[in-house]
Every structure is written in structure tokens, then in C-alpha cells.
Amino acid sequence: MDENVAEFLRRIILKIPLCEMKTILEAWDFLSEDQLQSINLKQRKEFLAQEVILLCEDKCASLDDMALLDLMYTQFHRHQKLWNVFQMSKEPGGNDVDLFDMEQFQSSFKRILQRALKNVTVSFRVYEKNSVWIRVAWGTQYSQPNQYKPTFVVYYPQTPYVFISSCYLKSTVPLLHQALKVASKHHQMAQLDLRSRHLDSLTAIVFNEYDQTFENYNSTASWREGSLGLKTDLDSKIIHENTEEKVRIHRATQEAFGAYPQPQLEFAQYKLETKFKSDVGGGILADRKEPLRCLVKFSSPHLLEALKSLAPAGIADTPLSPLLTCIPSKKMNYFKIRDK
């Protein structure tokens, strides 16, 4: 086995958590069952990596085999990437329904990249919900592909959506987009203002897969009794007012966010560009031609659930601004706010 391939494999093994080692190697389906059983998973990672390298040398493992293992590791740890969402479209009057041929898609995608760029490594794997995972390691006309900084693509056949991890070589982005459009038989490709490390949440948002069934508020008696925690010895009027206010906040929150778990996003960003306006005449900003610019960014490990909890916690009034509640429905978490 080539020295560079062995080093690539060593680095992959070192970054796989021991608790996932057996699962990932089994899913890789390169080593035999007997070889997998012979691996001592209780030894130090460095020795474990050498043992796997020797087993792969016996089977004459190639760079493509290692690239596939790296792709599988990324599928298990997809949250380590920042994913951008793109929406493709067909030509006006084009056929909206095309039969998808997996082999043709892979062949066309790979051929376009290799025609334009001699040194490129492309790997494919069909994963959950028939999604096509693609790993592209980019080189140049004069250098071999950098296997340690690949781009990952997740495409759902017969849909317009594709998810792409950040590319370290910006010059390769147009070529990647061209290969995707041609292979999937689309004409245009536009980036949405939506990105996150939680790929599953992004797919739930663009495909509207999160539960949108709102609760029925015709009867709130059981909710009042079980969740308010009011003391029975308080004045009955105060209890009634507190109960009604909590019910109102609860209803407004559920109407805005629904009664289902929210997709997990880490941030939302708002860029404000607006002219200065004042009822008071004059002022140093009154004649300013350039718009005022402001950037506001909200961040949280689970931003939408955090926003959903603001009003019930008494931190914000209801209803919340539509700019905060429309993120899933608008399919965006990057906003530009102008005068219009």
C-alpha cells in the first residue's frame, strides 16, 4: 500500500472515537468479518491504527477505499461541517419529472469534474432516504488532491435541494455547481440564506418534514390545572388573571412555533440597512445619503427552542417579531432588512 494512502488511513482511524470504531469499520464493508473480529479495540489508538493498516495492506487497499472510509466517518459526524443549502431549478417549460438514474448521475458528475480538472478524487455513497453523499478532494493541474480538505455534497434525487459543506478552494465552487446541475438535469442553482451544522434540521426545514400540527385550544382546563402551579390559597381573582395571561402566552407561542420540537439551528443573522428617519427636523444624520448599517446575530445551541421559550419565561412580550418566528417557513436564517 502506498505510503500516502497508509498515512491517510492512519489519520482517519485516529479521529474515529473508539466507541464508534467497530460500527464504522463494519459499515465500510472493506475488511472481512474475521479481520474485524481480530482487531483489538482495547489498545492505544496509535497501535490500533497500525493494526488496521496492516490488514488493509493485505487487501491492497487503494486511495479510493480510504476516501470512502472518510466519507462514512463524515456521515457519522456531519455536525462537524458547516452546511450551505442550494436550490436548483429547471429551464422554463422543461420536464419537471425525470427518471433518476444513479449510475448516470455519478458518471456524469465525475466526468465533468475530471474533464476540467485532472487531479480530483470523487467518491459516492447512497445513504438514508436515498440521499447521495459525494466526497470531492480537490487538486490542481500541478498538484495531487488534498485528501485532508475535501468538499462534501448531499443531494436528494428528484428534488431541487443540495447541501454542500464549505469549500476551502473557492475557485472550485463554479465547477462543482456546474457538475451538479448537469448531472441532476437542472439549469440554475442559487444559494439560500440558510446554513447550519445540523444537516438533519436543514433537510427538515427545506422539505417541511417537521410536524406542523398545532394544538387545539378549545379546551385549556387540563393545561391550566396541571402546569401553572398556582397556590390554591391565593385570591381567586389573581389566580384567574394569572391563568388567563399564561394561557394567552401559551397560545401565542404555540401559534408562532407550533406544538412540535423545533429544527436545531445555532444562529440567525440580521443585517439592517435603512435611512435615518426622525420627526424632529434637522440633526446631523438627517441629510446622510448612506444608509445606517447594523448587524444583529442571535446564537444558541438550539436557537429556535430558545426563542420559543422567551415569552413563557417572561423575557419577551408576545407575540414575538415575525422576523424571529418565520425562520423555518422562510427557509432562511440570514436576513437583510431594508427600508422596503
Curated annotation (Swiss-Prot):
KW Phosphoprotein (keyword) present: yes
Quaternary structure (record): Component of the CENPA-NAC complex, at least composed of CENPA, CENPC, CENPH, CENPM, CENPN, CENPT and CENPU. The CENPA-NAC complex interacts with the CENPA-CAD complex, composed of CENPI, CENPK, CENPL, CENPO, CENPP, CENPQ, CENPR and CENPS. Interacts directly with CENPA. Identified in a centromere complex containing histones H2A, H2B and H4, and at least CENPA, CENPB, CENPC, CENPT, CENPN, HJURP, SUPT16H, SSRP1 and RSF1.
Sites bearing Phosphoserine, chain numbering: S227, S236
Keyword match Phosphoprotein: yes
Principal location class: nucleus
Domain of life, per lineage: Eukaryota
Keywords: Centromere, Chromosome, Kinetochore, Nucleus, Phosphoprotein
PANTHER family registered for this protein in UniProt: CENTROMERE PROTEIN N
Organism placement in taxonomy: Eukaryota, Metazoa, Chordata, Craniata, Vertebrata
Subcellular location: Nucleus; Chromosome, Centromere; Chromosome, Centromere, Kinetochore
Biological-process GO terms, alphabetical: CENP-A containing chromatin assembly; chromosome segregation
A Pfam short name: CENP-N
Function: Component of the CENPA-NAC (nucleosome-associated) complex, a complex that plays a central role in assembly of kinetochore proteins, mitotic progression and chromosome segregation. The CENPA-NAC complex recruits the CENPA-CAD (nucleosome distal) complex and may be involved in incorporation of newly synthesized CENPA into centromeres. CENPN is the first protein to bind specifically to CENPA nucleosomes and the direct binding of CENPA nucleosomes by CENPN is required for centromere assembly. Required for chromosome congression and efficiently align the chromosomes on a metaphase plate.
GO-annotated cellular components: inner kinetochore; nucleoplasm
Protein name according to UniProt: Centromere protein N
Family: Belongs to the CENP-N/CHL4 family.
